[in-house]
Amino acid sequence: MKIGGWQRFSLIDYPDRIGAVVFTQGCNFRCPYCHNPELVDPRRFGKTIPPGDIISFLAGRRGKLDAVTITGGEPTRQGDLADFLTRVKELGFLVKLDTNGSAPFTLAMLLEKGLVDYIAMDIKGPLEKYAAIAGTEVNGRDIVTSVSLISGAGIPHEFRTTLVAPFITPEDVVTTAGLIPAESRYVLQRFVPAKLLASGLGEINCFTDIVIAALKVRLEKHLSCVAVR
């Protein structure tokens, strides 16, 4: 388990819970606007943190923390993810998994073992634009399968799309929302310009507040829960 960083306290990562956050190292996507390049680009990797250090910390925080969010990078790339989550669950913590949905077989295994209590999946955009947005070829069937697994798992979940122009347009978001069941929560994430994976991207921006508000109203005609973050 390659852990590139962690946050001992968070009020925002697991909805309505006090938690810690674990950042795994490594990702199979290369989204140019990624804000965690040190977890994606091997040339920027730092020293890893022993999983045992995290487990020891969590053991001492029982009764004070409720949950642990596993994010990245892409956590499902970690071969021993299930073993780590088992140890976290044995300590009595809820587990939230952030994923890009590219590994449905891993998701199915984690769900079958009851190792995840909440899943947040990033849907980058329409399937036909995935390669351009993710910076690599992506199997669209894997994305669709992951959406189906997550939405049918019977646990709290959300799907998220980052609103970053020119990689994605408002019409692209509407198309993307069509991949999501009406009863699932869909989160429109504002893009915040900061450190990026790629350089020389030119002008990239979040949608304006007016565009986001209009988009939310439009999506709410088809989805039961649309949030802006």
Stretches with model-predicted labels:
Residues 23, 71-72:
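A secondary-structure boundary/capping signal
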Residues 16-49:
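Canonical Radical SAM [4Fe-4S] cluster-binding loop centered on the CxxxCxxC motif
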Residues 55-67, 76-209:
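Conserved AdoMet/S-adenosylmethionine-binding subsite of the radical SAM
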Residues 209-229:
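Charged phosphate-binding loop/patch that engages nucleotide di/tri-phosphates or the phosphate backbone
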Residues 6, 189-191, 228-229:
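Conserved beta-strand termini and adjacent loop/short-helix elements that scaffold enzyme active sites
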Residues 1-18:
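Short, charged low-complexity linear segments at domain edges
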Residues 2-7, 26, 52-53:
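SEC14/CRAL-TRIO lipid-binding/transfer domains and related phosphoinositide-recognition modules
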Residues 37-68:
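Conserved alpha-helical substructure of the radical SAM core
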